[in-house]
């Protein structure tokens, strides 16, 4: 059995575990008053639709886990825990750094409260089942030899790419505001239109630069695992990161709103999906253009 098949099976099981744990801690969060009132109504009654969705993402993350397994620190099931904590960093923590400036503090606390339990459990489950299946079906396979580069080599290209990503996000936000596609997010307060535009550019540039610097460092680590050459490597990497971060999060929200017939919110979310995808493509183009493999 190939390692990616083992990863997909382990991910399927871990995705089911993710659903159960998410449901438990989501309900606990609701019971203690987390999440804004307008959002709570969409948070309940989604178990049936969440099961196939979380299993799908579990399979996707399981396949990726099988590809990067030998690059992850630790041994055995601890690799799975590290992998889960990595996703806790780049998904809920990253997402909430974008939401808090808009005043969605209670939602951010609720999401982090659930995620701090869900992602480590997902990672451990993935690590356990991957190891069990790997030991049974690929017991003689040794550690893969993957050529990696110093993560510091990706810091500056990542930071510059993040600045450009932030500028792109700021332009899109201003265009959306001018055309009436979306207004000021819940919790946001502005004094003037110009102030709103400046805040959009400033916030997006700063936050995207910080996270893109981190993504740039990991790009150097997984460079030889990413499809494509030169600039296209950057684009492929960016689209993968979009898929497993913003793309994954948007799919959860989209399903929750669709399950409650909130179709206006669904339409806005679909627009956001393409907007964030565009921003990531800009990041990938610049990263691929600027990154240079360190000299041996």
Please give the residue ranges for each predicted region:
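Juxtamembrane/disordered regions of integral membrane proteins
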Residues: 1-296
